[in-house]
Each structure stands twice: as C-alpha cells, then as structure tokens.
Amino acid sequence: MKKPILSLLILVFLVINLNAQRKCAVGDASDEKLKRRHEILNTKLQDYYQKYDKQNIFVDNLIRIPVVVHIIHNNTSGKIGGEGNNNISDEQVFSQIRVLNEDYRKKISTPGFNNSPVGTDMNIEFYLADKDPDGNPTLGINRIYSSKSSFDVFDENTLLSSLSYWDSNRYLNIWVTTLKDDFLGYAEFPVGEFDGLELEEVDEAIDGVMIDHRAFGSKTGTSTNGVYTHGRTLTHEIGHWLGLIHTWGDEYCGDDFCNDTPPTESGNLSIKCTPKYSNCRGTRTLNMIENYMDYTADSCMNIFTNDQKSRVRAILEVSKRRKRLITNSEFNLPQTEKLIVKVLENPSSTDYLQFQILLNAFANFNYEIFDASGKQIIQASFEDSPSRLIQIPKIDLGKGIYNLRVKSGEEIVYNRLISQ
Ligand SMILES: [Zn+2]
C-alpha cells in the first residue's frame, strides 16, 4: 500500500524526537577545556611513541577493570526496578556489564562481533567489584536516594560524587541517574605523565562515567524503548574514559588520531544504520558508522579498530590513575594501616615462596632476601605500587633458611623464609 508522504515524514519526525539524538557531553566542542585536554593527551602520546619501541611496550594482556555502579535515584519508597523507576534493578546492571564484555572482547555470536579486518578484540573485561574499599565483600552496586530528580552533567558531577564515590585509583565509578538536557552520558578522560608538560589532572572524585538510566543496560528495566537501549552508550563513554576521541575529532573532518578510522565530517546521528559518506581532504570516503565512538544508534555499532586499541594501550601505560587501577585489580589485595608482610605457607608446598606485601597507599617499596651468612641473594624494587603478591621460584634460592627484608618509606619489616 502506498503511504501518503506527509504521514511518513511525521512518523520519522516523531521517531527521532521520541528517541532523542545521541548526546554525549564529551563531544561538546564549545568546551575549550576538553578540547585542550585532547591536544595535551595527543602530544604526550607522540612523545611516548618516539621514546619507546611500540612493539615492545604493548603487550596484549587481558586487562580486567573493576566497576562500581552508583544508582542515584529519587524513589522515596526505595522500591527497586519497575517502569520508569530510576532505582533500576540489578538485572539492568548485569545486562550492561554483559554488553561491555561482548563489545570490548568482540565476542562471537553477540552484537559486539564484527568481521572487519580492522576490527579488534580490545582484550579488556569489566566486572562488578567484589570487594569494597575496606576489603569487604560487595555486589559492586550502591543505591543512594537523593531528592533531586535529575543532574546536570557539567555542573553537578561533584554533587553526584558527594552522594556516593569509591577511590577512582581502584575502581571505575559509574553514576547511573537521570541526566538533564537529554544527555545520555559523560566521561572523564585519562591523562598521561611526561616530563616538560604541565597537566591538569581531573579531580579524583569525579573521574568516571555519568550515564542516564534509560540508556544504561540492554533491553531491560527502564532501558527498553528507543535506539539507545542496547547498552552501547556505556561502551562509548568508557571509550572516552580509556582515552578515545569521537571518530570525527569533535570538529568538521577532525582527527581522532587513529589511522584506520576514515576521516569523517561529523558525528552520524543515523538511527537506521544507512551508509554515510564524507568529503574530507578532497576524497569521498565511507564513514565508519559502526564504530563505538560515533553517534549512531546502538544497533549500528560493533567495532573498535586496531589503532584505537594501540591508542588505549599506550594511554594505559602512561596514565597514572588508570595504571594504578589495573595493577590493583591484578592483585586485588587490601590496603592496611601500616606495612604488613604476610608469608603464605612457610615452608611452601609449591615451587614458589610467596608473600603478600600490604601497603597503606600506592607506594614505593623494595624487598631483599639474604642467606644465613647475610649475603644478599635477591632484591627488587617497585614504584607507585598497590599491595601485591610476590612469588619467588624456589629454584632461585635453593634449600635453606633465608631472611626477608621489606622496606617502604621509613617502615621496615623482617621475616624468615624457609625453602625446602
Ligand atoms: Zn562521546
């Protein structure tokens, strides 16, 4: 049946309005501060590439990122889940974590898979934190009531953090609430550290992602209607948190500093995934509307590229706060009030002598192992380290009784190690 053109136009107009347009506050090009931060970050990365051999630095290890989800809701009854309730269900949170892992691992048989030669498995996984900042078991979900019905992404991030926050050196904080002005989400960028450059590190307390509950999770709870309900807003925002820039570089035919994402005139707001083209630098090219760092509808997205991965890996090496978070996650040991050394199973029944070094903050420390005659056999130093596990192969020591000396700042702890 032939439809009147007028009603078709009205329908399209309504659909667009009902779904709103993807609005990621990071792309607000009028914000000079953000733009400057992009420039600083890229200058530093270029230095980094020159300083080190790229091949040797980027080990493709699996990175696991602990996430804490703060649900800031205005539901006085405290009821969890249900239609329109911004005190969203645990299931909605779980659906979001699942999507992150599908997208960042390019999982086969999921919407996060692609066949593109430049499409990559980022080799990054996300999990709800299993220990709170005091080391107690947790689900990684905090529910906080606030009488405020919505929050402004630019002016009220500190307020949001004051309601609930875990150390951003150890957790990726995600604040899920109702955002003002149709924004879907906002993320803070990482920074690197190089000599000779001054950097404005963002306040620890707001380092994370803010996201509207209606764009959080996949087809679950309050995230069911519209084109931004497949969980890709958070995939996109965490891309920023890891240092990625929009594919059009936040300006007309701008640069995202990745060579395998084609030049793009501007963000694509397509909700039907139809091909889009750009005419940048005198050449007509197909836009990569499927890139997570574009503005297309969730269902169009399924790709991070090899260069985006290289960029993220470089940033994770140089960004102090991100590196701390990843290292801490690797060991997942508690902070203590003072330096404590715990020798595990002494003598050990395995091929290793193992001891935990528990610190009260990220700190420098060294350990030395001496034989019975007082001769130093092994020593190692660590900088800006969280509490960590040390494993010494018995074969490196031989049988005997050894003295272990651990020093961090002014604190020194001695222990005896038995190697049998
Ligand atoms: Zn964005």
Describe the function of each predicted region.
Residues 1-29, 100, 389-392, 414:
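Bacterial Sec-dependent N-terminal signal peptides
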Residues 3-4, 379-383, 399-420:
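C-terminal tail/sorting-segment detector
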Residues 21-168, 178:
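Propeptide-to-catalytic entry region of secreted or membrane-anchored zinc metalloproteases
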Residues 154-246:
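Active-site-proximal segment of zinc-dependent metalloprotease catalytic domains
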Residues 217, 221-302:
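The catalytic-center signature of Zn2+-dependent metalloproteases
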Residues 301-338:
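A recurrent domain-boundary module in secreted/ectodomain proteins
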Residues 335-360, 370-375, 399, 417-420:
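Surface-exposed, proline-anchored Ser/Thr-rich loop/turn motifs
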Residues 354, 376-397:
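Glycine-centered tight-turn motifs at strand-turn-strand junctions
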